[in-house]
């Protein structure tokens, strides 16, 4: 193992639950405002997961007051306090970009049994 691999292995988190595109997550994000920090929960559907190792990222989409909001997080960042899997989604794609064009109940994802 070379030096970069050792540094990457030291930065990996082991408290990340298994999740896939289509799952609904609660991501507890540390928000720092001035000298204070607080935890903010971002709840949405995983529409993408890409990369590997330290550089792995995932994108979550939610609709807030009628406006679609997408946020991309690195999986192994220290800014994420914890990730909770709320529901498992039953989808057949790895990238759920088609959800951007759907409105209302059409954008709903079936729950895995």
From Swiss-Prot:
Annotated S-S bridges: none
One Gene Ontology term, aspect cellular component: cytosolic large ribosomal subunit
Record's keyword annotation contains Ribosomal protein: yes
Gene Ontology terms describing biological process: translation
GO molecular function, one term: structural constituent of ribosome
Pfam families: Ribosomal_L19 (PF01245)
Database matches in InterPro entries: Ribosomal_bL19, Ribosomal_bL19_CS, Ribosomal_bL19_sf, Translation_prot_SH3-like_sf
Keywords: Ribonucleoprotein, Ribosomal protein
Coiled coil: none
SUPFAM superfamilies: Translation proteins SH3-like domain (SSF50104)
Stated role: This protein is located at the 30S-50S ribosomal subunit interface and may play a role in the structure and function of the aminoacyl-tRNA binding site.
Family named by the database record: Belongs to the bacterial ribosomal protein bL19 family.
Protein name in UniProt: Large ribosomal subunit protein bL19
Organism: Corynebacterium diphtheriae (strain ATCC 700971 / NCTC 13129 / Biotype gravis)
Source lineage: Bacteria, Bacillati, Actinomycetota, Actinomycetes, Mycobacteriales
